[in-house]
Every structure is written in structure tokens, then in C-alpha cells.
Amino acid sequence: MGLLAAIGVLLPFPFYWWLWTNAQSWVNLCGRERDPSTVMARVSHVLKAAQLLSLFSVASLSWPPPLYFWPLMAFGQFLNFRVYQLLGEAGTYYGVRFGKNIPWVTEFPFGVIRDPQYVGSIMSLLACLSWVPFQYILLWSLGYVFMMFLESKEDPNARAKSIS
């Protein structure tokens, strides 16, 4: 089950890489009738479910969790929800790459924490260390670090042109 769990944990990252590097292809594939950010969100939710199932397949759940669980999970999820609240679906799911005009956000956590959604996700993963073997948490976290690096090299000329 270890190899399948590792594959499941890594499953979304090739998809995200492909979208980031082939934004116009994704916009064309979605066509005029479907919003590329919404379609990306739906696919991402399915892939996230596969990731979580992969973690559960190797987890040893126990109660109560260690004390470090609560602040890491709470602040990590706060960051995730706050990013979504400020950016919305289009801002969270590569809307800028897909040719949408997304306003620049400077409210917390932006301007204070670099890549707050990824930081929040990594914090949430670290909260689960008492239940999930370290190598799976590390693998998933390295996927986020890879995406942070990839997205830091954004070239405005590589953005998709809207087909609407």
C-alpha cells in the first residue's frame, strides 16, 4: 500500500504543473461554455479526495491528538479559508493564468506570509504527523514547495488569452 499511497499523495501535482505551463491549452479545452477556473476547481477537489484517501490508507488514527495538532491545524486552515475568501474561486484556481483580471490583494495574510495557502496547507499536514508516517507528509509538502517554486516564476506573456 505504500507505493499506491505515495502516488495518491503526488497525484494532483502533475495536473497543476500542466495547467501552469499550458494555460492556453486548458482554456481551449474548457471552451466558451465552461469557466476554466471552475473546471480546475472541480478536478482539484477530486484529486484532493484521492490525496486524503491515500493518507488515510497509511494513517493510524488515535484520540486525543497531541497538543501541537490544534494550533497547526487551526492556523493552517484559517490561512486556507482566508486566501479563498480574499481571492475567490478564480483567484485561487489560476484565474490570472487563464486570462482573467484578478485584483491584487494586500490584506492579511498577503504581504505578511509568502504563499499563504501553501503555508497553511503544509501547517495542516504537519498537524497530522502523529497519525501519518513522516514520509507521506514530507512527500505532499515537497509537492507544495515545488508548486511555490513553479508559481514564483510566472511569466505574464505565458498567460492564456480568453476565448469568450
Swiss-Prot record:
Taken from the record's topology, the Cytoplasmic segments are 53-69, 152-164
The UniProt disruption phenotype note reads: No visible phenotype under normal growth conditions.
Q: Which GO terms describe its molecular function?
A: phosphatidyl-N-methylethanolamine N-methyltransferase activity; phosphatidylethanolamine N-methyltransferase activity
Q: Which organism's genome codes for this protein?
A: Arabidopsis thaliana (Mouse-ear cress)
The free-text function statement in the UniProt record for this protein reads: Catalyzes the second two steps of the methylation pathway of phosphatidylcholine biosynthesis, the SAM-dependent methylation of phosphatidylmonomethylethanolamine (PMME) to phosphatidyldimethylethanolamine (PDME) and of PDME to phosphatidylcholine (PC).
The UniProt entry's sequence similarity note says: Belongs to the class VI-like SAM-binding methyltransferase superfamily. PEMT/PEM2 methyltransferase family.
The UniProt transmembrane annotation reads 31-52, 70-90, 132-151
Q: Which residues lie on this side of the membrane: Lumenal?
A: 22-30, 91-131
Q: What is its EC number?
A: 2.1.1.71
Q: What is this protein called?
A: Phosphatidyl-N-methylethanolamine N-methyltransferase
**Domain of life here?**
Eukaryota
Keywords of the record: Endoplasmic reticulum, Lipid biosynthesis, Lipid metabolism, Membrane, Methyltransferase, Phospholipid biosynthesis, Phospholipid metabolism, S-adenosyl-L-methionine, Transferase, Transmembrane, Transmembrane helix
**What membrane topology does the annotation report for this chain?**
Multi-pass membrane protein
Q: In which pathway does it act?
A: Phospholipid metabolism; phosphatidylcholine biosynthesis
Non-spanning membrane segments, not crossing the bilayer? 1-21
Subcellular location(s) per record: Endoplasmic reticulum membrane
Q: Which reaction does it catalyse?
A: a 1,2-diacyl-sn-glycero-3-phospho-N-methylethanolamine + S-adenosyl-L-methionine = a 1,2-diacyl-sn-glycero-3-phospho-N,N-dimethylethanolamine + S-adenosyl-L-homocysteine + H(+); a 1,2-diacyl-sn-glycero-3-phospho-N,N-dimethylethanolamine + S-adenosyl-L-methionine = a 1,2-diacyl-sn-glycero-3-phosphocholine + S-adenosyl-L-homocysteine + H(+)
The answer, when asked if rRNA-binding is one of the entry's keywords, is no
Q: Where does S-adenosyl-L-methionine bind?
A: 74-76, 154-155
Instruction: Give any Gene Ontology cellular component.
Output: endoplasmic reticulum membrane
UniProt-listed GO biological process terms: methylation; phosphatidylcholine biosynthetic process; phospholipid biosynthetic process
Instruction: Please name the InterPro entries in this protein's record.
Output: PEMT/MFAP, Phopholipid_MeTrfase
